[in-house]
Amino acid sequence: MLRAVRALICRIGARRTLSVSSSRLDVSTSNIAQYKVIDHAYDVVIIGAGGAGLRAAMGLGEAGFKTAVVTKMFPTRSHTTAAQGGINAALGSMNPDDWKWHFYDTAKGSDWLGDQNAMHYLTRNAVEAVTELENFGMPFSRTPEGKIYQRSFGGQSNNYGKGGVAKRTCCVADRTGHSMLHTLYGNSLRCHCTFFIEYFALDLLMDKGRCVGVIALCLEDGTIHRFRSKRTIVATGGYGRAYFSCTTAHMNTGDGTALATRAGIALEDLEFIQFHPTGIYGVGCLITEGSRGEGGFLVNSEGERFMERYAPKAKDLASRDVVSRAETIEIMEGRGVGPEKDHIYLQLHHLPAEQLHQRLPGISETAKIFAGVDVTKEPIPVIPTVHYNMGGIPTNYKAQVIKYTKEGGDKIVPGLYACGECACHSVHGANRLGANSLLDAVVFGRACSINIKEELKPDEKIPELPEGAGEESIANLDAVRYANGDVPTAELRLTMQKTMQKHAGVFRRGDILAEGVKKMMDLSKELKRLKTTDRSLIWNSDLTESLELQNLMLNATQTIVAAENRKESRGAHARDDFPKREDEYDYSKPIEGQTKRPFEKHWRKHTLTKQDPRTGHITLDYRPVIDKTLDPAEVDWIPPIIRSY
């Protein structure tokens, strides 16, 4: 092992310069022989230890695969723990239900940008996934009869939208993600997975288009670790911290999507950013949609339950994009609350105190701490807040990462999987339904393990790394560590976040987006002016935050470019200058007699953004939406309609 380490250091020290992405600093290899490099070999390496990563790890460990989990924080601190409201599955505990109704709601919620084969896989496997969680020991809330308790969530209906609001969301009070994370972590330890905790993934290791592992920095002692593997799973979460006001934790910096970008993989549908209707005003902390599922409602300055005007049937339980836009319109038209009339009230105090204590204990505490509100007596001040990324690393329904070409269609990237929020299986399309996120995590984390078990055997040979693997990553690390510009990381990050908040918000307009694109491109060049004040390698948060900013910048620039280019309104992407959804047909009218628009003339297609790793230039392409289900005899595709709730 030591001989291999010394050999790598010698090879790295022999090189002089490297050409790197514009999102990185100008680097030189002259100083990097000082870094200790340690090699590891595993059947599978998983980057990230949230719900998706842990579910994949557990399945692989049970099957006897030597599995490593590389995570930049302790697993139970992963952002899955912040998920409050629940996980969707058509169990039928509270009322008759059918997974096909769940499938319909998911397709409708996506505003018909989701791939229906993947949505078929998600909803058909939902009941089994939740039952497995129960068997693993997840302590779901119960009905008096002992069944898993289910609440209403936005966009969920019975009988294909004809039977009223469904109760489909299984929960553990309002701490569902916390409970899931602890359950999965405990079970993955039982399966003998090896955890590399507080390791920061620097880059995927690629060999002629195949992923053969990952290179990471140990935050505790500054050593570099190269993990070679037969399969690599990216499960790093979203990039909410590209925005100023968001519900996501500070570690949600788009590391996985940035890893994919630097590996030459185009990202899918990044323009679709979900704004949750109820983030605490001025703070951003999440107030679960479950609070409205339990009977809470939104009011404006006139005390009006205004959602009745925007969604006469679903009211406060319309899909999140609809509710967030309604709130924003109320504020823009002068009906906001507070001294500045710039937010909305969420009212819960009409509900029995016992119900709040039993079903919503966490948000009662959160509202008290962060808003100074007693929910049994006062409304909670809320505002739409960045919450979720619908886009990410494109995959098929098996969670295999794909590249799309017009000539060959979808092609699998050998050796690479993705799951969780960093992935775009395209089950959410243009707008995710509440409580489909935890479901996405466990279903596609599970899919990773199922498909890897079909592809591999534990005793197969692990491929060798190519010559000089990871050199560029170490050189960039060294350049960031010794960066001596005049712009502090925190200052540049704040400017980026405010730019994204202002120019790519709930409502968008061409001139504002174009201005935002220019600003973001200029800001990305400012990365070369970063100043790192701490030169150490041991628990150096200044260094880590600079690396995270590089990742955030890649995500933010691709997001705003994709948003500026999509000239329609669909789901979470709402354009004032292009207020209509542009499909291949006008679905507000009978399609008989209509001529189908060619692919380049409509917008019911996935955006693909590919950022050049050397120039920073972003190339746009488009991928067709998959309308065909996995088995039309089991459930046929849901044709587009004009959404209403």
UniProtKB/Swiss-Prot annotation:
Cofactor: FAD
InterPro entries on file: FAD-dep_OxRdtase_2_FAD-bd, FAD/NAD-bd_sf, FRD_SDH_FAD_BS, Fum_R/Succ_DH_flav-like_C_sf, Fum_Rdtase/Succ_DH_flav-like_C, SdhA/FrdA/AprA, Succ_DH/fumarate_Rdtase_cat_sf, Succ_DH_flav_su_fwd
Record's cofactor remark: Binds 1 FAD covalently per subunit.
pH-related activity note: Optimum pH is 7.5.
Membrane topology: Peripheral membrane protein
Active site: 320 (proton acceptor)
Modified residues (Tele-8alpha-FAD histidine): 79
Gene3D superfamilies per UniProt: FAD/NAD(P)-binding domain, Fumarate reductase/succinate dehydrogenase flavoprotein-like, C-terminal domain, succinate dehydrogenase protein domain, Succinate dehydrogenase/fumarate reductase flavoprotein, catalytic domain
Binding site for fumarate: 85, 276, 288-289, 387, 432, 435
UniProt KW Cell membrane keyword: no
GO biological process: mitochondrial electron transport, succinate to ubiquinone; tricarboxylic acid cycle
Subunit structure: Component of the mitochondrial electron transport chain complex II composed of four subunits: a flavoprotein (Fp), an iron-sulfur protein (Ip), and a large cytochrome b (CybL) subunit and a small cytochrome b (CybS) subunit. There are 2 developmental stage-specific forms of complex II which have the Ip and CybL subunits in common. Complex II from the free-living larvae (aerobic environment) acts as a succinate dehydrogenase and is composed of the common subunit Ip and CybL and the stage specific subunits FpL and CybSL.
Family: Belongs to the FAD-dependent oxidoreductase 2 family. FRD/SDH subfamily.
Reported function: Flavoprotein (Fp) subunit of the mitochondrial electron transport chain complex II which, together with the iron-sulfur protein (Ip) subunit forms the catalytic core of the complex. During the parasitic larvae and adult stages, which occur in an anaerobic environment, acts as a fumarate reductase by transferring electrons from rhodoquinol to fumarate.
Protein name in the entry: Succinate dehydrogenase [rhodoquinone] flavoprotein subunit 1, mitochondrial
